[in-house]
Amino acid sequence: MEKVIFFGNGPLADYALAVIERECQVVFHARTREDLEEVKKIKRENPDAHGILASFGVMIRSDVLDLFEPEGILNIHPSLLPIYRGASPIESAILAGDSEFSVSVMKLVKAMDAGPVYYQATLSDLLMDKTAIYKALAETGAEWIVNNLGSLPEPKPQDEKKATFCGKLEKSMGELSPETDSAEVTFRKIVAYQGFPKPKYTFFGVKCIILEAHIARSGETAVLSIPCADGGLVAVDRLQPEGRKTMDAKSFLNGYAK
């Protein structure tokens, strides 16, 4: 059984780690920058341990990267690199209107998401659900890694001319703006901003987090909807008024409609 030192936190890391733990011996899980000194100690004690990373959130120092040469630390990045380098590739793909979602396994280098690529896959027919997309991409990348540890192919360099970048999500992004956005854009923001920064809209003077929604079909009578700039409607299925518990649209109307 191959030994692994795993770097990561958040949903992408959780889904990837679940796959890796079934097939490998995880000798240490680094979750924060403060764990990097312990990584150096564990790696010296386990020189044959592979490094795998998924959504660690901080740059790995050169003194840590060097310990894993020549194989390097394998980074599961949820995009078709060099597209969507950076902190929010899945959310950026959702917001851009992409219908397919990709994952790359690359060798970690000092430059952000710029290392040579071992493997890429593109998944279609995924539900427009952020959790499902995270899970599918993390598992696809992790499964390839556990099946190829010890016999990795030669990685291929990225084409720097095709690189695009995405930044961190900010709390202010959660405020929906359907007065200027189409129903499609509003819906994609609701999907992309689940978890953080949380999509918000005000009904009857009550600010709410929108948890589940869909684009209303022609002729559909929605219980609760958000009117958008193109004349379309986003039907809200589940929501959470600030400071209150989650409820469906009908329950919200019964309690808050004036």
Residue ranges and their predicted role:
Residues 48-57:
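Short, structured active-site "lid" loops
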Residues 3-5, 10-12, 21, 56-166:
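Donor/substrate-binding cores of folate-linked one-carbon enzymes
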Residues 26-36:
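A short beta-strand-loop structural module common to alpha/beta enzyme folds
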Residues 16-25:
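A short, Lys/Arg-enriched amphipathic alpha-helix followed by its capping loop at the start of a domain
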Residues 36-47, 66:
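Short amphipathic alpha-helix with an adjacent loop that forms part of the alpha/beta core around
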Residues 160-258:
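Internal anion-binding site segments
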